Amino acid sequence: MTVIESRLIILQTNIYIYDYYRMTGEQYHIGLLSLMHWFAAHNLQFAFWYRKYQKTQSVMARVALYWLSRKYGLDISPKASIGKGLYLGHPYNVTVGEGVVLGNNVNLHKGCTIGRVNRENIGSPHIGNNVYIGINATVVGNVHIGSDVLIAPNSYVNFDVPDHSVVIGNPAVVHHKENAIEGYVCFRV
């Protein structure tokens, strides 16, 4: 086995590395720069402790997650299913409810809310791969958001969105566009 193959195996088994790469654009390596990223960037800290708590249910991870949640207003349920390569851009007041499914390479930005409703469209959202959810955007209900979708800031989405789309406004309007996330979702894993 070559060195490159062994690094790929480590990368595939350690989901924290994907989040690190998405948020920094750099391959994780043990060193001072990586440690500075981990300690300085609360989005990386939250992603790390969130993954750790989901995997181990440890008390230490729960305490760290609770502290970061309270300090930065990050309310992401441990019962949500989040794929690899989560990107928390300007991570303040982000809410992801119980039962939500996020695919790989999803960008969540300040003030976005993703959750269930208990009336007409009962259930939680299922969001595909390579999705950008802008500032103060809201996605609610038993909806399916396709892959390669950009949800613009301040949009309210409570309906299904097909692949390769841009969603704008409140009420939301869907525009079909190939490569909708080009330039928005970077460093994909």
Where are each of the predicted segments found?
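Terminal amphipathic alpha-helical/low-complexity segments used for targeting or macromolecular assembly
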Residues: 1-72, 181-189
